[in-house]
Amino acid sequence: MSAPDSIFVRACKSQAVDRTPVWFMRQAGRYMPEYRAVRKQHSLLEICKKPALAAEVTITAAEILGVDAAIIFADLLLPLEVMGLPFHFSAGEGPVIERPVRSREDIARLETGRAGELGYVSEAVSLVAKHFAGRIPVIGFCGAPFTLASYMIEGGGSRNYVHAKKMMYNAPSDWDALMRKLVAVTTAYSTEQVRAGADVIQIFDSWVGCLSVEDYRRYVLPHVTAIVKALQKTGAPIIYFGTDSATLLPAMKETSADVIGLDWRIPLDEAWTRLDHACAVQGNLDPVLLFADWKELKTRAEDILCRAGGRAGHIFNLGHGILPETPVENVKNLARFVQEYSASASGFRPPASANSGSKTKSRKPKAGSPEPEAGVS
């Protein structure tokens, strides 16, 4: 770990901090001219596989935005290649899996002993950690088993996840075998990122919101929990993020992740209440609000901070990744506003909007005050 005492890492551990830490999912991406300049010369996978380039775009984004953490630039699907499942990106379609996994034989052919071939990601982590030298922490990440399996089985993105759910329902033993292989690979992959200098690991479960609570508990929860438990042995806090997951929050808490990432579809304080305030939370501004005028954007960010109420364990973020056409200045201004507002003793008042089912009491603590009062993102 390169920055174990940073406000971000401490917030992940639900420890008191002077202000709310902030970073953004997909903070290095197409909305930044600097990233687009690199992409003119290199493909996405080339950037991922060349540690110096991956480190460059990671560092550039964090420094331009002035955020409190740098998330390593990589692609969610990289582990699929070392399992023997090649993929490519198609314009307008996104990732395309060349040989979808649809049978027991397909699962049997998947390899689990080649995670070391992803060493280029760990090397990029090491370069970023050395550059920041403890000034800000580095976030490593991996895809969650369900989300990776969905891509593998569907052959790419999906609206209904018919093929993935068919395997879950009709061949549960095959599903579990696939999950176990994904747990092994993602655990090894993420552990190497921590060894290389990552302070925190985020597990992205981008498509988990398509599941009922019953299906989540049966087909997903045990496998995510296995990854979380294994990675926590490294000493790194674990963030578990899923979209459209409001109904799943109590079950997601059972993974024992240190932080649960929230999307924007549920008020922060209501979500934290559903989690019984048993962990830290991250979020949860709608990414599209970054296209709004400053007055509206500021009001919505302030509302989230007020719903956090100064409770220890809130990390400000979006409810999903930054969108490609987002104005860079809005992202920079938002980061600075969160930092300055949360550092002020007067920065916590009742929420401006009344769209939450839980009440937030007026108070004036420093951000990260340990006394429970309201919810978080």
Where are these regions (language model features)?
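N-terminal basic, low-complexity leaders that serve as flexible interaction/assembly modules and, when applicable
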Residues: 1-91, 127, 305-306, 328-343
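Short, flexible, mixed-charge acidic loops at enzyme active sites
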Residues: 85-99, 151-164
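A short acidic, glycine/proline-enriched capping/turn motif at secondary-structure boundaries
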Residues: 76-79, 94-95, 103-105, 145-147
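A gly/proline- and charged-residue-enriched helix-loop-helix capping module
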Residues: 92-130
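Intrinsic disorder/low-complexity segments
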Residues: 343-377
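Active-site loop segments of alpha/beta catalytic cores
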Residues: 117-344
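The substrate-binding groove and active-site-proximal loops of carbohydrate-active enzymes
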Residues: 45-49, 107-118, 287-291
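Short glycine/proline- and acidic residue-enriched helix-loop micro-motifs
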Residues: 40-43, 103-113, 168-177
